[in-house]
């Protein structure tokens, strides 16, 4: 049995397995398969997909909508631990802003511009990326900023009422599994192959997310969308609760067992 997540090193392995009639499962996280997976699909037994649109574009006997497994430790966060870690109170909702590992300059800049207005309604956790801290905001009440968080991330998610994030496949699947109402700001097509835009629009169509493209960001637009997201948060939680992305691990392991048993 071969299981592949893509990448150029997997291509000869999957092709060789196909020639030897060894069951092979590919997992594609993004809406449009990357080059390695495109090459491997003819040799694969099944293709696990993250989006309904991807399933429709692939051979019907191969494509399966499974979603993407997430880190299980993210499901076990503690609100109380996060509140103590951040020094927050329990009298305002919490907005978490995730700028990505390198930080999203336009997101960081505009969040900080509207921070005085945001702090009237929210407490804000800002994961701003390496080298993107603003020391002038260090002691601002109700606002904490970190370059990067690992150990406490599950706790911060548990405390957060709504989240702003990029639209990488793994990130949005984590938000979906955690049922966190979210605003996605995908990487622009100028800075990527456009997969984040496609990912975000699919989640928007399914009722999981709001989307604001980077070119559309202004102070007033960002503030209004955040308020709208919070006001309608329950509808997003409901949609995510009904999502086919739930139980991804069970779906994929079941598929592996089926393929092995049919040898």
Model-derived features: where do they sit?
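C-terminal alpha-helical cap of glycosyltransferases
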Residues: 245-263
């Amino acid at each position: 049995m071969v299981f592949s997540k893509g990448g150029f090193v997997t291509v000869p392995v999957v092709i060789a397995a196909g020639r030897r009639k060894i069951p092979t499962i590919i997992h594609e996280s993004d809406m449009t398969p990357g080059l390695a997976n495109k090459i491997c699909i003819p040799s694969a037994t099944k293709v696990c997909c993250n989006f309904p649109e991807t399933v429709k574009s692939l051979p019907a006997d191969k494509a399966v909508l499974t979603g993407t497994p997430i880190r299980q430790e993210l499901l076990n966060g503690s609100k109380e631990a996060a509140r103590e870690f951040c020094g927050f109170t329990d009298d305002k909702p919490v907005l978490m802003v995730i700028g990505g590992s390198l930080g999203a300059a336009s997101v960081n800049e505009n969040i900080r511009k509207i921070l005085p207005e945001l702090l009237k309604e929210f407490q804000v956790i800002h994961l701003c990326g390496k080298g993107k801290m603003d020391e002038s905001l260090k002691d601002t009440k109700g606002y904490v900023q970190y370059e990067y968080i690992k150990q406490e991330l599950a706790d911060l998610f548990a405390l957060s009422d709504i989240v702003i994030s990029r639209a990488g496949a793994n990130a949005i699947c984590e938000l979906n599994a955690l049922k966190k109402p979210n605003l996605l700001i995908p990487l622009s097509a100028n800075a990527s192959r456009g997969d984040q835009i496609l990912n975000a629009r699919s989640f928007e169509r399914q009722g999981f997310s709001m989307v604001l493209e980077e070119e559309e960001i202004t102070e007033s637009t960002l503030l209004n969308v955040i308020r709208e997201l919070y006001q309608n948060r329950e509808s997003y939680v409901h949609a995510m609760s009904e999502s086919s992305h739930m139980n991804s691990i069970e779906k994929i392991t079941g598929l592996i067992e089926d393929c092995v048993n049919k040898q």
